[in-house]
A protein has these predicted regions:
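Active-site beta-loop-alpha junctions enriched in small/polar residues
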Residues: 9, 62-64, 97, 124, ...
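An N-cap/entry alpha-helix motif that binds or orients negatively charged groups
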Residues: 2-72
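N-terminal active-site wall of soluble small-molecule enzyme domains
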Residues: 68-168, 174-179, 205-208
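Glycine-rich phosphate-binding active-site loops on the catalytic face of alpha/beta enzymes
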Residues: 136-152, 189-198, 238-259
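Conserved, mostly hydrophobic/aromatic
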Residues: 6, 59, 84, 92, ...
Length: 267
């Protein structure tokens, strides 16, 4: 299973990083960030942006994936930033998983330096260490995957909130949704891709949205490959969408950009 391989590699990488910067030291750095935010009365913009009227769009910085291989050969993050700014993306999702998605922390650090747009750190979080790391890197939100964390979801959710990070909790079926609701998770990402076999169906959002309380923020993830798909998923009543591959493949397509902007204007 691809997911198992990703998690195994992640465990090795996290242990290696703990030797470079000890956990207590990193936690201290993260708390220092939080204290500065409190002093500056900084409000995390993540939820506010996702709760705004109309459909919120999270655009992903995505070089590769296990199912599609390399998506963007010439991966220039400043070029992608300009493109996303031009088409009006609300939140940036930055992949930092190195082995299977070819992401890296530096992408997030660099974007944070030059943009005020809220950032979701997209990775496979299995250790509190990565929560502290996300804070130090400058993320506003982090991905927590219900199928990866299981019952540990509650403690990871709480720890993220302690560091003023908004967790986007990813689910794929009713059992995972029940887990997210048990821990009163506010932002629920419905992944239309099964992480075990990587099959995709937009019907997953259609089915699960009926079971999600109206006060939650619902984000549809994966499988949105056209403007038509966007219109379909919007009709299901989601609050937002997370799109990676479609945007990455259309970076130089002016016809797509015009169509997308038209879609946004009709939201």
């Amino acid at each position: 299973l691809i997911l198992d391989d990703i998690i195994e590699m992640k465990k090795i990488r996290v242990e290696k990083r703990k030797k470079e910067i000890p956990m207590k030291e990193l936690e201290k750095q993260a708390l220092f960030r939080v204290e500065n935010e409190v002093e500056a009365s900084f409000r995390n913009p993540f939820i506010k942006v996702l709760r705004k009227d109309g459909l919120s769009v999270i655009g992903e910085f995505k070089k590769a994936s296990p199912s599609k291989g390399i998506i963007v050969e010439d991966f220039n993050i400043k070029e992608i930033l300009n493109y996303y700014t031009y088409i009006g993306i609300d939140v940036f999702s930055i992949l930092t998983e190195e082995d299977f998605f070819l992401g890296c922390d530096d992408y997030l650090k660099e974007i944070r330096k030059i943009s005020h747009t809220p950032i979701l750190r997209k990775d496979f979080i299995i250790d509190f260490y990565q929560i502290y790391e996300s804070k130090v890197l400058g993320a506003n939100g982090i991905l927590l995957i219900a199928s990866v964390l299981g019952e540990r979801l509650g403690e990871f959710y709480k720890e993220a909130k302690r560091f003023n990070l908004e967790p986007l909790v990813e689910i794929h079926n009713k059992a995972e949704l029940d887990l997210a609701l048990k821990y009163d998770c506010e932002i629920i990402g419905v992944n239309n891709r099964d992480l075990k076999n990587f099959n995709v169906s937009l019907d997953i959002t259609k089915e699960l949205i009926r079971c999600i309380p109206k006060d939650k923020i619902i984000i549809a993830e994966s499988g949105i490959m056209s403007i038509e798909d966007l219109n379909v998923i919007k009709e299901y009543g989601v609050d937002g969408v997370l799109i990676g591959e479609l945007f990455m493949r259309k970076i130089n397509d002016s016809e797509f950009k015009a169509k997308y902007k038209e879609f946004r204007n009709n939201k």
